[in-house]
Structure formats: C-alpha cells, structure tokens
Amino acid sequence: MTFVETVAVPDNEERPSAGHNRPVADSTKCPNAREMKVQNRVAQRTHHRRLKTKLEVLRERLKEPEKQVGEPARVQTSTSTLVSDAATSLADSMCLVPAVQNDQAMAFDFLMTPSPSVGNDCPSNDLETMRQAASVHSNTLGGAFPLNRSPCTENMTPESQVSLSTAPLCFTSVVPAELDMDAFCTLDSSDWSRPNEESLLRLANYSTSVSPTNVQWGVDENAPLQDRVRYMRDQAVAMGFGSLDDVVEAHYTQKLECTSPSFQEQRLSRNRRLSRLLSTLHNAAKDWSEWERRGLQEQVTQGAEDILVSELNSYITQRSMNSTDDKIITGGLLDEQSRLRQDVEERRRLQDSLPNLGALLTTLLSRSNAPNQDARRDTVLAMIKTMCFDQDENMSIS
C-alpha cells in the first residue's frame, strides 16, 4: 500500500536545509493533504485488523489437529472385523462361480490364466517383502491428506473408530479376515512401520497353509519345484478338480468346444505330447517301488491286450470275407510259385492289418535267438494263421 506523506510547514515558510532533498508538500497548495493522510491511516488500521483476525482464525484451526496428534491412537481390540469385507471380496474373487466349476473348458481357460496380483507392496512368503509392505507409515498419507478420516467412521462408536491414516494400506485392504491382526496393532502409530518378527512369521505361516478357497499369493517361476506343484494343485482344487490327475484326465478325455482356446491344445497334446508323456512315465517307473508301479503296469498291460485283441478280431473278420484266404489257411492245391506270391501278399496284409500284434511277435522272436529274419517272418505268419484257424473252423461249422 502506498502512503502519501505530508509535512507540516510553519507559517513563516522557512526554506529547507540545503542537504534536505526530499520534496515537501505545502498544505496551502494542497488543501486535501490532511484529509488524505487521515484516510490512509484509517485504511491501514482496517487492513491490519483484518489480517489479525485471519491469523487468529488460522491459529484456532491449527490447535485442533495438534491436539489430535498429541493424543494416542485408539485402536480396536481386534481389527479382523475391519478387514473382513476386503478379504472376503478378494477371497471370493479367487473362488470359482458355479458356472466355471461345471464347465471344463472354462475351467481350463481360467486355470491357465495368471492369478490376479494383489500388488507388489502386499505381504508374501518373503519376510523382506513383508517388511517393506509394513513400512508404509502414516506420514506417507498424511502429506497429501492430513488427518483425514473415512466418512463411514462418523457414525461409529469411539471404541471402533480407527484412524485410517495410521494403518498400513496393504494390511487394511487384503489381509484375510481369518488372520488375527492383534499382533500388528499397537497404541503407538509409529510402531506400524516396525512389526515384530513373530507377527511376520505368523503371517508367513498363514499364507503357506491357507486353504485353496482363501487368498492365494502366487508362486514365482523360480520357486522350488515342490512349491510350484503345490500351487498348481491348489489352483486345480479351486477350479473344481479333485487333483492334478483329474486335470490331466479331463484335458485328454473331455470333449471341448471348438471355439475354446484349449481345443487346439488338446488335439496337439493327443497327437504329440501324450506319447512322450507315456514314455517318460514308463522310464521313470523303473525307479519306483513295486507298490508304486504296480497300478501303472497293470493298466499298460490291460491296454495292450485290448489293442491286440481288437486288431486280431478285425483281421479275422476281414479274412472271412475274402475267399482266397481260405486256400492259404487250408493249404489249397497251388503250385510253389503261386504259394510264394500268396505268402508275400499275406505278410503285407498282416503288416497293414496287425501292426501292433506283428511287432510284438517279431520282438519276442528276436529276443528268443531265432535263426534269421526270414525265419522270424515265417514264424510270425504261422502263429497268426494258427490263431485265426480255430475261428475259421467255428465259422465254417456254424
């Protein structure tokens, strides 16, 4: 503000000293100078009073937060009820809806999708990660929102009100309701950034022993194999499967929709990966105990029997419909050259119609020190003819 300064000059109008260079206002030449001076002083005093009033108001406003900071934080006896809603919603998001449990294709797609992350600052099995998550102090939130309280706490009783700015955001958002958080709660808000080692171990033990329907923290790809297998087993159970074996069984046997992403994956697995899987199981079973591999060997043997019997029955049915085969079986009147030609055709037909049975008999003869390759082929042909002879006799009698 600019102030107009006037200097009263005596009646004799003495000249100012030579060293005084400031101009002097003459009241005779400026008749309103005194009035302007009075008005300026009044305006200045009014402005000072307004500033003083504003300062007093600001001081009163600052006194109330200072009192709240000085008072100890009142914490509820157990904070599990405050975090139950958030934990339940997150746990529900990990569980399957009935539609997914009843739909194998949808369950496969959901199982192969990475589980939703709850944030890098949330507690995990690593104690160091939990320490970093727990180090979120109230000052971090207080800088932007000083001493703000949630509107939902206005109607709560004083015993159940908890200052949201003094609690770590991670613990109040995703901690399961079943986990007792009393060990993390202290009367001093500064202790939030330094939870004791026992509390961290309790949280770590809970996260490793949690049931599949509860919160899943996820497993890193560099984790030990047993941890990754256990995580996939828990995910399979959460998808509605009984075990990982049920997942593999459904993957190879269930009829999936053509539009499902798992459909092409299933076809590729049946054609290429299944044979490699069976070979790996067969080789690995050699190191298992007799009790462990008994079931696998029985199923493999039974499956081989079904395949060989089915091939033989199909071949017999095909032979019975071909009249020329009767001459080969009964040794009809054919010259030596015609008989040799018939034998070659018969071997070729055997290779096409009985690939597995022929391979099995050839392998057995090769390990029994048979004389030569031609003799093994003749022996295989004779064995197959013998197996078909009784069937042909029964058909001719009937």
From Swiss-Prot:
It comes from the Eukaryota. Transcription factor; part of the gene cluster that mediates the biosynthesis of KK-1, a novel cyclic depsipeptide with 10 residues which is a promising active compound with high activity against many plant pathogens, especially Botrytis cinerea. Positively regulates the expression of all the genes from the KK-1 biosynthesis gene cluster. Disruption phenotype: Decreases the expression of the entire KK-1 biosynthesis cluster genes and almost eliminates KK-1 production. Residues 51-58 are annotated as: Leucine-zipper. GO terms for cellular component: nucleus. Its main location: nucleus. Residues 31-62 form the bZIP domain. Keywords: DNA-binding, Nucleus, Transcription, Transcription regulation. The keyword Nucleus applies. It is found in: Nucleus. Pathway: Secondary metabolite biosynthesis. Belongs to the bZIP family. Residues 34-50 are annotated as: Basic motif. This is Transcription factor kk1f. GO terms for molecular function: DNA binding. The keyword Repeat does not apply.
